Regions:
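Sec-dependent signal peptide cleavage junction
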Residues: 9-23
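N-terminal domain-start motif of subtilase-like serine proteases
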Residues: 23-40, 89-96, 118-152, 170-182, ...
Length: 425
């Protein structure tokens, strides 16, 4: 299992880490490297962005005038989701200089993140997970193509997979020439969300939706928050095209820098769907799952595509139970199947994977479907629709139809994704 790194420990100098885009000067960093998530000497800097003020400056100009001669390495420049840069500094003196710089609005540690995935388990089919949320009934809306764009910010997507409509690709991982998936995780998410309805393979929740392969994780499934923000910066550059973004990744940590980038993406009109995490803990300690503006998704085990708990049991719990690994808590908005999910994989293949990573693209596909039918819907409209149309605790199973799941670990009882035709319309 690929897990998040380390135990969260941070010394904040302000209380609110869910920062707004109009932020006062904030310093959220710990220069003492006893947190495994923190990347030593690596920081995310946001600059003042009021063009009418004298303390506004271009990020590259700022680096050249303030940092280049100090031996600081420039990693990324951000222009769209925020104005800022990611840097690697030679020593603590540079950090102290930045704290007193009038151009600087925010300083935060860069951190390691990872894909929320478990170990793989091995004519076209409708996966049981799609059946469980009644996704197969939606094929009559548009059997060949869903008019929406889904960005997968992950390990990339198999660019040549015959079952996927990869519309655009971009990699932010050094040493790669494109966003072709060298791990498999991102391709799996893409198939769950949007595999084509054709004569082979599988069918996704939003068949044939345009996929944006945004590679922000390495072949190991690991990455850095600064790289993820660069991916968010890129989709914000294309905010008039991208409808939904999937972030099935994170760490057990806080990141004000990532919160700001996500909140600005949502304000730009992009619905952000994230995985709750795979540690069996309260998701409130995980980033980006704990951001109140995103749609956070937990995972259930479902083995027969039906309610009632009559399917075979799994290593992660009985059929129709909250998966044993799934994070939970009041930050979770909705649940979806996430155990032994059969989907597309790298090298034009298919496999089963397990994790809240697999649950999130079910919800992202549903969000894309809703946007295709309601183009003017805001991210908040989409989130509200998915939550209010979901299956609730009071929806009992009749033995074969759709009903709630069991084994919720808290008293919040997030709804189970449901997207039957009568709901989506």
């Amino acid at each position: 299992m690929i897990t998040v790194c380390g135990i969260f420990l941070v010394i904040p100098l302000i209380e609110n880490t869910h920062a707004e885009d109009n932020f006062e000067k904030q310093f959220l960093f710990n220069y003492f490297y006893n947190n495994q998530n923190i990347i030593p000497n690596q920081f995310i800097i946001y600059l003042q962005d009021n063009k009418e003020e004298s303390n506004s400056i271009d990020p590259v100009e700022f680096y050249n005038s303030e940092l280049k001669d100090t031996g600081t390495e420039l990693l990324y420049v951000y222009y769209n989701v925020v104005k800022g840069l990611a840097i690697k500094i030679p020593d603590e003196k540079v950090l102290e200089q930045l704290k007193n710089n009038p151009f600087v609005a925010y300083i935060g540690n860069d951190r390691k993140i990872s894909a929320f995935i478990d170990t793989p388990t091995e004519t076209q089919i409708i996966p049981a997970s799609v059946d469980r949320v009644d996704g197969e009934s939606l094929n009559n809306i548009n059997p060949n193509f869903v008019d929406a764009d889904i960005a997968i910010l992950d390990t990339g997507i198999d660019l040549d997979h015959a079952d996927l409509n990869v519309f655009h690709e971009r990699s932010f991982i050094p040493g790669t020439i494109n966003a072709d998936d060298d791990h498999g995780h991102g391709t799996h998410l893409a198939g769950v969300a949007a595999a084509k309805d054709n004569s082979f393979g599988i069918v996704g929740i939003a068949p044939g939706a345009r996929l944006w392969a945004i590679k922000v994780l390495e072949s190991s499934g690991m990455g850095e928050i600064s790289t993820l923000i660069k991916g968010l910066d890129y989709i914000n550059q294309n905010q008039n095209q991208v409808d939904v973004a999937v972030l099935s990744l994170g760490c057990e940590c806080e990141s004000g820098a990532l919160d700001i980038a996500i909140n600005n993406s949502i304000k730009a009109g992009i619905t952000i769907v994230v995985a709750a995490g795979n540690e069996g803990k309260d998701a409130g300690t995980f980033t980006p799952a704990n951001n109140p503006e995103v749609i956070t998704v937990s995972a259930i085990a479902d083995t027969d595509g039906k309610c009632g708990g009559n399917g075979p049991s799994t290593p992660y719990g009985a059929d129709d139970m909250l998966a044993s690994f799934s994070n939970y808590g009041d930050v979770v908005d909705i649940s979806a199947p996430g155990v032994d999910i059969y989907s597309t994989f790298k090298s034009n293949s298919y496999t089963k994977l397990t994790g809240t990573s697999m649950a999130a693209p079910h919800v992202a596909g549903a969000a894309a479907l809703y946007k295709s039918l309601h183009p003017e819907a805001s991210p908040n409209d989409v989130k509200s629709y998915l939550i209010t149309s979901g299956t609730n605790l009071s929806d009992l199973c009749n033995g074969s139809g759709h009903g709630y799941f069991a084994g919720d670990k808290d008293n919040f009882h997030e709804p189970l994704l449901y997207i039957g035709t009568n709901k989506i319309n």
